[in-house]
């Protein structure tokens, strides 16, 4: 009995509140010479903060790169002249090097590469058409690979980082209009470009070499009835996989996830799982809404049909323990705001609202071994699809870290059954000075940095309770969970 009691106590101790300590803070005065700070963690190598000079001269202004240690101590500062109209577009970390993409409305771009090991900056200049998008940026073998849409034409772009030269592979299919072709995702694996391309109602896998020459094109969905909405290619161990979302209807959002091995450039043992068949998928909803969904499910089942919810999912790369495979997806939906100007109604996109995440374990045949869903609510709605959860293998178990409203969350899932064996949360304290309070915080963002460390940053109005002094700053605060 005593042994059983000790085991229960030990198990309960794993679900606890953790202490988050403010272990570093950087502040930039609101009226300083630089603005539009971009916070870019480089794993455990440090932190980069880039910003743009407010003043310009002869059409040029300075772009500053500051590099901080993990202790938030300034190590190096460097500035380069850029065209006045350039703005931050995207960033990628590859092999420990941070690549920042700056773009201008006329189509020109600059790629700024910062190496934390040498503190050196190199730049690549180039031009791209004004109306061309740059999606799914990947850095590999001295090149930037991306997908793009220009005048209803989709293409794969390859930029040489040494010369700035751009090469493009335009994607065409016989008897298919270019406007009905769209690159869902592209990545580089083993020096080969893999692109998943929507072609009308089908999805093709395209393979290209690093010069843009096409190596093959296979229709992945010729023999399946489901419509693939999103998909990504991963390599785990020595096997390739495709995961993403699907729908059984011709229109609307996704109604479930799929998992398949990629063998000989074709689906092998593809399996589909309705969101509502997953464990706790609706737990984030109110009791009233859950009950409503259950009634609709029962009604559909009596009619011999399957009820489904429409959702979008930001899928992560597949992880493996060497035997089985783990899928992580973050559920979100677009939010629109409606305003009236006179008699005219204007609808504008307000960002993506993230609600919860799904962690699932599959065997190589695509069979679902277990799944867990948990709520997550970031502090802001991003204007683009991104990942808020950081995932890694901790031994054989799966470790997830993320921010949920004003909390820092760490969850450890047991490999065998998906049960949470360690669940730690901590409230975010805004400053490390007990005499100061944050009265206002705008454009707040938070993300996992490395280990058990997080960053929270945004524009703040801080008040000192003793002196009554107020100051407006852009602040970056580091939290370490204990």
Functional labels for PLM-detected ranges:
Residues 203-324:
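Long, internal scaffold/assembly segments composed of regular secondary structure
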């Amino acid at each position: 009995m005593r042994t059983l009691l000790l085991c229960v106590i030990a198990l309960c101790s794993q679900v606890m509140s953790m202490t988050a300590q403010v272990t570093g803070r950087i502040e930039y005065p609101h009226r300083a010479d630089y603005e539009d700070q971009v916070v870019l963690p480089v794993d455990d190598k440090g932190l980069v903060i880039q910003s743009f000079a407010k003043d310009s001269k002869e059409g040029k202004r300075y772009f500053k790169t500051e590099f901080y240690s993990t202790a938030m101590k300034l190590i190096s500062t460097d500035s380069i002249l850029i065209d006045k109209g350039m703005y931050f577009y995207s960033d990628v970390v590859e092999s420990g090097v941070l690549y920042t993409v700056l773009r201008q409305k006329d189509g020109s771009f600059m790629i700024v590469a910062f190496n934390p090991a040498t503190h050196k900056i190199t730049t690549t200049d180039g031009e791209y058409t004004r109306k061309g998008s740059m999606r799914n940026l990947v850095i590999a073998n001295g090149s930037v690979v991306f997908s793009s849409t220009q005048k209803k034409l989709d293409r794969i772009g390859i930029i040489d980082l040494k010369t700035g030269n751009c090469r493009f592979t335009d994607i065409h299919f016989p008897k298919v209009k270019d406007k009905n072709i769209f690159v869902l995702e592209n990545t580089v694996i083993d020096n080969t470009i893999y692109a998943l391309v929507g072609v009308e109602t089908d999805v093709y896998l395209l393979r290209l070499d690093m010069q843009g020459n096409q190596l093959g094109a296979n229709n992945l969905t010729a023999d399946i009835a489901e419509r693939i909405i999103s998909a990504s290619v991963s390599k785990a161990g020595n096997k390739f996989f495709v995961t993403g979302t699907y729908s059984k209807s011709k229109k609307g959002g996704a109604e479930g996830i799929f998992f398949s091995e990629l063998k000989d450039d074709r689906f092998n043992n593809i399996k589909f799982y309705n969101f509502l068949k997953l464990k706790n998928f609706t737990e984030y909803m109110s009791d009233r809404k859950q009950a409503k969904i259950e009634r609709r499910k029962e009604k559909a089942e009596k009619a011999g049909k399957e009820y489904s919810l429409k959702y979008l999912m930001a899928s992560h790369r597949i992880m493996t323990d060497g035997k089985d495979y783990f899928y992580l997806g973050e559920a979100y939906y677009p939010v629109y705001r409606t305003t009236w100007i006179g008699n005219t109604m204007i609808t504008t996109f307000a960002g993506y609202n993230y609600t919860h995440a799904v962690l699932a374990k599959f065997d190589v045949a695509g069979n679902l071994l277990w799944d867990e869903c948990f709520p997550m609510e970031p502090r802001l709605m991003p204007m683009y699809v991104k990942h808020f959860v950081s995932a890694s293998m901790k031994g054989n178990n799966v470790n997830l870290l993320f921010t949920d409203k004003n909390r820092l969350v760490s969850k450890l899932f047991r490999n065998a059954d998906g049960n949470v064996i360690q669940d730690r949360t901590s409230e975010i304290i805004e400053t490390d000075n007990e005499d100061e309070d944050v009265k206002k915080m705008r454009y707040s963002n938070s993300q996992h940095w490395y280990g058990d460390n997080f960053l929270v940053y945004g524009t703040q109005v801080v008040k000192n309770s003793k002196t009554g002094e107020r100051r407006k700053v852009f602040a970056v605060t580091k939290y370490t969970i204990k």
